[in-house]
């Protein structure tokens, strides 16, 4: 929740009618999900009952964890932090794209979440391997990064960056420097 602050990327004037929340609502410690609606939608359900849930509805421990997580988001200003650090991360990834012919596309820029698409030829954006295969050289990059304490998620030709909202600026910078170095090594082979 709030990693990408995607609903805010269209500006404050764009109001959402309905939003679903889940894993991040409790910091992924307990299962809890919610559907948050605006006043217009809420009024509809005052007269038209929606029968859902039962077993896990309103579980007190999960709700308490959700409340604590929401307080932490506000108290620690994690949303603002996600926007700022995510913006810096995305700018650095765009610079990496200029330096590395393996990078075909960088997607994200709305918070601490981004995807790098790796290609064998940037001009035609040919993937390194057919989807959903992970190219061996990319699997090697991930293993090297992990041996140095940095975890990059991979799906096929995609590197997924989703650092924790509480990551320190120097840790994020170090991870991006490492990624730059590992991409350079990958291009040399």
Task: Locate the predicted segments by residue.
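Conserved N-terminal phosphate-binding loop of PLP-dependent enzymes in the Aspartate aminotransferase
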Residues: 1-189
